[in-house]
Amino acid sequence: MSQVRDTPVKLFGWTITPVSHDPYSSSSHVLPDSSSSSSSSSLSLRPHMMNNQSVTDNTSLKLSSNLNNESKETSENSDDQHSEITTITSEEEKTTELKKPDKILPCPRCNSADTKFCYYNNYNVNQPRHFCRKCQRYWTAGGSMRIVPVGSGRRKNKGWVSSDQYLHITSEDTDNYNSSSTKILSFESSDSLVTERPKHQSNEVKINAEPVSQEPNNFQGLLPPQASPVSPPWPYQYPPNPSFYHMPVYWGCAIPVWSTLDTSTCLGKRTRDETSHETVKESKNAFERTSLLLESQSIKNETSMATNNHVWYPVPMTREKTQEFSFFSNGAETKSSNNRFVPETYLNLQANPAAMARSMNFRESI
């Protein structure tokens, strides 16, 4: 009679085989020696257990090998994918690597072809940055022109105007503004002032002083040249300094040049010291040294004295002429002063021209 066995069951990866058990044999045959029966049953069960263990070991090995193979495959797949991604990115980088454009773009400012490619703005291929060597400017393709020059290269407008680029103004430039011929100093660079000759001869520099009578109305004289730092001339026309100044004339009498007398503005009494006599003597000597303008009146009648024309001419002073013709010193004198010169009264008369005119008329009538 063939024994029917159950199929093995897999549970959690383990295969469980059922144990073959015959109930009829156990119930029908009852042996007195229980020990012999138990030993025989144990011996019969051992080979089944060994078979089960071997089967489970084999299945576990197969499962582990399968898992290892799957992990290897997944790792290989991931490696392949990563390598593919890296190759793709490297290819993209190679393709998108910022290469210099082959075309030379002309400058949009000066239309010159002397340009060069510098870089891509923000690593963008659509914004290449170029530089023009002619106008020293940067610009981006598709963008606007930069006004301020940036970067390397020598700029033409770099720095201030050097000292050797001053304008030279001559008399020809000023003829349009003034009909009279004038001479204006021209400032040159400091390099032109340096010459090989260390000394100047006396015959090289000559200053011609023209007489005053030739230019009665036009004061075109210039001051002698002075040592001053080199600076550019004033861009506007300015009148030159006059060679002399007219002295004011009040009521037909000229006022002489200011002397070194006591020019204090306070009037009234002053303390009489010994120094006052010394100042009087010094002022007398100063008046004798200087040349004064004297008035020559052609008096036809005593009644037409105020309407006559006055002619002025310079006459050098001497001791005899001062006593005869110097009305300035006599204007301050009185009959009781015994020909004594008082500078205070002279200053007072000089400050008041009306009083001076009255004093002159009074002296002429005496």
Curated annotation (Swiss-Prot):
It holds the Pfam family Zn_ribbon_Dof. One of its GO terms (molecular function) is zinc ion binding. Its main location: nucleus. Disulfide bonds: none annotated. Residues 25-45, 56-69 have a biased composition (Low complexity). One of its GO terms (cellular component) is nucleus. Residues 70-83, 91-103 have a biased composition (Basic and acidic residues). Zn(2+) binds at residues 107, 110, 132, 135. The keyword DNA repair does not apply. It is found in: Nucleus. Keywords: DNA-binding, Metal-binding, Nucleus, Transcription, Transcription regulation, Zinc, Zinc-finger. PANTHER family: CYCLIC DOF FACTOR 2, DOF ZINC FINGER PROTEIN DOF1.3. Transcription factor that binds specifically to a 5'-AA[AG]G-3' consensus core sequence. This is Dof zinc finger protein DOF1.3. The lineage of its organism: Eukaryota, Viridiplantae, Streptophyta, Embryophyta, Tracheophyta.
